[in-house]
Amino acid sequence: MKITEGYMPYLEYKTYYRIVGECTGNKKPLVLLHGGPGSTHNYFEVLDKVAEDGRAVIMYDQLGCGLSATPSRPDLWNAKTWIEELIQLRKHLGLDEIHLLGQSWGGMQAIQYACEYKPEGIKSYILSSTLPAASLWEKEQRRRVAYLPQEMQDAIAKAEKAGDYSSKEYQEAEAEFMLRHCAGAVGPDSPECLRRPKVAGTEAYVTAWGQNEFSPSGTLKNFDFMKEIEDIKEPCLITSGLLDLCSPLVAKTMYDKIPNSEWELFEFSRHMPFVEENEKYIEVLNKWLNKND
């Protein structure tokens, strides 16, 4: 499979991108927006197989993480920076018609892009384990925190009250929460792209989102497109896991509000069904893409 890597100038920095395969016939490329902010493209390499269907798959590290520039620039860590980076990437690579998949923060980015920028040439959106509003997300994570052992709940409350997240007790509580709803530990049997060391965009995450998944406090804390998503015209596939941070309530809220949408719930997954149920996810995704080219 042909893999092309390169860098695009963005602001005074550079953005790394990776293109797998080429489009054949009438197929349109699939562009992937990673989560975080700051999570890197790495985990998306488990979707390289989508290119075997005769479709280019394009992933990139958003500014502030991975193989892209990682300046200490808290002033840049907001939705506008990353959406304009996507717009620039489409121009740079001549991506007139695409399918756009955003996971977690990447899905928020896709939603804001769709609602505020109303871009042309989007054949479909795939909203993967994402959210229409930070307030709904916080409410659902708080509900789930209440299922942790009491001492873990207490450690979280103490850390939040003091604004100090360095205690061992807090870190163990957060790790348990993420183990339940985000992802399992990476081990020797995990795909290489998950085991590979990466430059996580910690500053980008903390500045834009916050200290953890249940306390949005950064530049995205007021993210809310609950009303606007009702006007998305393009076909939308919503994907989520049963134990996902994107709970069935969050996913169904999007499904109910977005007119031309379908929802696929992955029964054995947390926040990354494309990793945990890889074969099924690729099957669902290929079927969707072929239907909407």
Curated annotation (Swiss-Prot):
Alphabetized InterPro entries for the sequence: AB_hydrolase_1, AB_hydrolase_fold, AB_hydrolase_sf, Peptidase_S33, Pro_imino_pep
GO MF entries: aminopeptidase activity; hydrolase activity
Coiled coil: none
SUPFAM superfamilies reported for this sequence: alpha/beta-Hydrolases (SSF53474)
Name assigned to this protein: Proline iminopeptidase
Gene3D superfamilies: alpha/beta hydrolase
Family named by the database record: Belongs to the peptidase S33 family.
Active site: 104, 244, 271
Segments forming domain AB hydrolase-1: 28-277
Matching PANTHER family: AB HYDROLASE SUPERFAMILY PROTEIN YCLE, MONOACYLGLYCEROL LIPASE
Pfam families xrefs: Abhydrolase_1
This protein's encoding gene: pip
GO annotation, biological process: proteolysis
EC number: 3.4.11.5
Catalytic activity: Release of N-terminal proline from a peptide
Role according to the record: Releases the N-terminal proline from various substrates.
Disulfide bonds: none
Alphabetical UniProt keywords: Aminopeptidase, Hydrolase, Protease
Domain of life assignment: Bacteria
Group of enzyme by EC: hydrolase
